[in-house]
């Protein structure tokens, strides 16, 4: 599918509002994130003080970066999403099975329900790893995500044509080919999918 991304004035953003009194940009739902300015002072940085805009997550839930694992012919495979984001270097990047803030997952945008979300809240799925990790603090203010890996023992079905089951070796080989693998999949792969993890159970 063809995508079109064009620059528009901030005043023209649909459903986003500039609060002149507070000097921030917010979504009309009061969810997602806030664009706000910060003045920083730190003596041991390149400069001792600076101003910059930040994206600040609304609420403290953060987001979920989730991977579904399933053994195919006794070999662990991971459900990977070929996901489009407008700011991606090459538009489509390989991403975890589930990726989004709680505002996205709660469908504040009134869009489609995530096809994988329910798997993470069913009792017949085993949690392999669950850990809160931080985001890039240079641009995102105190943002965190829940890295969540689950084991699925059923038939390895695909939620849609966007998804594919890959082994850790295949993911590692794709990482070596540049920006095709997105940062969240890189992070969860290198942080949690060590040899003892993928061979367990």
Predicted regions located by residue number:
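NUDIX/MutT-family hydrolases
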Residues: 162-180
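Core of folded catalytic or high-affinity ligand/protein-binding domains
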Residues: 43-90, 96-99
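Extended, acidic-biased charged interface segments
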Residues: 115-165
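Compact, glycine/acidic-enriched structural inserts
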Residues: 89-125
């Amino acid at each position: 599918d063809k995508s079109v991304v064009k620059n528009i004035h901030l005043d023209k953003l649909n459903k986003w509002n500039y609060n002149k009194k507070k000097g921030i940009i917010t979504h009309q739902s009061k969810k997602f994130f806030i664009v706000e300015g910060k003045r920083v002072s730190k003596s041991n940085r390149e400069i001792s003080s600076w101003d910059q805009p930040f994206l600040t997550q609304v609420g403290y839930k953060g987001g979920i970066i989730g991977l579904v694992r399933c053994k195919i012919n006794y070999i662990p495979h991971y459900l990977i999403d070929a996901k489009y984001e407008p700011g991606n270097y090459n538009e489509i990047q390989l991403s975890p099975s589930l990726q989004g803030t709680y505002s996205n997952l709660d469908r504040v945008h009134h869009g489609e329900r995530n096809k994988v979300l329910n798997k993470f809240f069913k009792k017949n799925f085993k949690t392999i790893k669950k850990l809160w990790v931080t985001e890039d603090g240079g641009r995102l203010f105190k943002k965190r995500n829940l890295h969540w890996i689950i084991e699925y023992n059923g038939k390895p079905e695909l939620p849609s044509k966007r998804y594919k089951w890959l082994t850790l070796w295949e993911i590692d080989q794709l990482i070596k080919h540049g920006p095709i693998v997105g940062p969240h999949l890189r992070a969860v792969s290198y942080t949690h999918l060590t040899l003892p993890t993928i061979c367990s159970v």
